[in-house]
Amino acid sequence: MEPAAKTNPRMMRLGLPMTIDVWRNARIDFGATALFSLFNVVLNQFYVAFAIQEGASNVQVGLLTAAPAIGLLFSPIWASIMERSNNPKPFVILPNVIGRLLLLLPALFPTPSVYVAVAIVFQLLMGIQAPAYASLVSRIYPSDVRGRLMGYVRVSMGVLMIPLAYVVGNWSERFGPSGPLIAAAIAGTISIILFNSLHLPKQPPLQGAGGSKKARFSFKEQWSLVSGNRILALFLAATTLSGFGNMLSVPLYQIIQVEVLQLTNIQIGYTRVAYFAALLLTFLVAGWMIDRIDIRYTLLAGIGAYAVVPMLYGLWGTYPAVIVGNAVQGIGEAIWDIGIMAFVLRIAPGREAVVFGIHLLLFGIRGTLGPMLSTSLTTTVSLPLLLVVASLFGWAGTLLFYWGNRKQQL
C-alpha cells in the first residue's frame, strides 16, 4: 500500500485531506446513505408502531424489539468466517439486498405474524453484515479522517430523516403503512447496490491462519482478546449494563406512545423529528470529538443517555417527555453508532471484526432477554416501575465506565 499512497496525491475536500479514492468512496457513501434514509425511518421508527396498529400483542412487540438482538447472537461465528476470508464486502452486500426486499412482505400481507417473521429474518441477515461492516469501514476511510467522514455521512442522513419522519407519519396516517413499506424496500435496495461500487484497497494475504480453509469458530480465541485488555473488558461490561436497560425500555416506549398516550402517526412523526434532529447534531459533534479528544468522553455521554431516557418516560410519561426522550435517545444512538465502532477500530486494529462480533453477541443476549422480559412483566408490574429499573441499569453502566477508566491510558 505504500507505493499506492505515493502515487495518489491528497486533496482538500470537506476541510479534510484525502486521496482521490477516499473522496470517491465518500461521495458513494453519501449517495447510498441518502437513499437508505427512507428505509431507516420506516424500519427503525415506524415498523413497530405499524405492527401495533395492525393488532400486535405485547409479546409480539417484545419479539419485534428483540429481533435485532436475536440476529446478532450469531455474529461472532460470522465474524470468524469473514475475518479468515479477508473480504468483508460480500458479507455486507448480499444480506442487505435480501433483507431490504423483505420489507415488501408486510406491505402485501399486513398481519402481526408477518411483521414479526420479517423482522426476525431481516435481523438474522443483519447479524451477518454487522461485524463485516466494521471491518469494511476500516478499509473505506483512513483512521485520521474516519471519525469526521462517518459523522458527515450520518449528518446527511439525519438532515433527510427529519422531513422524512414527518412525511412517513402523514403518509401512513392517511393511506396506511403499505406505501411507506414498499417505498422503503425499493430505496433500501437501490442504496446497497450503489454502496457495492465502493473501491477498497488491496489487502495482503492472511498470514498463518490458512486463509479460508480454516474458518473455524473459537470462543476461546475471541474471548482471549478481552481477558488481556482491561479497557475492552470495561467497555463490554458497561455497554452490557446500559444496553440491557435500554433494551428493557424500548418496547415499553412503543406501548406508551401507542396504547397509553394513544398518539396518532402524525404525533409519532413529531417525536421522530426530535429524535433525528438530536441524532443529526450529535453525529456532527461526536465525529469532531472522536478525531480530536479521548474517545472515552464521547462514549460516556452515549452510555449515560440510555440511563436518562427511561427515567423521562417512567417519572413523567407525558407527550412532552416523549419528545425530549426521543431527542436524548437520538444522542445516545448516534454515539453508539459511530463512537463504538471508532473505539473498537482504535483498540483492536486488525481484529476489529472479531471484537465487534463479541460486542454484538453481548447485544444479542441482552437485546433478546430485555424486551421479552419487560413485555412479559407488563401485566403484573407497572410501566413506570419497569422504566425506573431500566434507568438504574443505565446508570450502573455509566458509573462503571467512568470509574473504571479514570486512570487508564488508551
Regions from the PLM with identified roles:
Residues 128-141, 335-348:
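Intracellular juxtamembrane helix-capping segments at the cytosolic ends
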Residues 6, 199-221, 409-410:
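Flexible cytoplasmic inter-helical loops of multi-pass small-molecule transporters
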Residues 90-105, 185, 297-312, 391:
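Structural signature of the two symmetry-related core transmembrane helices
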Residues 106-119, 313-326:
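Helix-loop junctions at membrane interfaces in 12-TM secondary transporters
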Residues 179-197, 385-403:
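Symmetry-related core transmembrane helices of the 12-TM Major Facilitator Superfamily/SLC fold
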Residues 74-87, 172, 282-294, 378:
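Helix-to-loop junctions at the C-terminal end of transmembrane segments
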Residues 6-74, 78-82, 231-272:
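Helix-loop boundary and gating motifs at the non-cytosolic
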Residues 45-49, 53, 80, 84, ...:
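Transmembrane alpha-helix termini and helix-breaking/packing motifs in multi-pass membrane transporters
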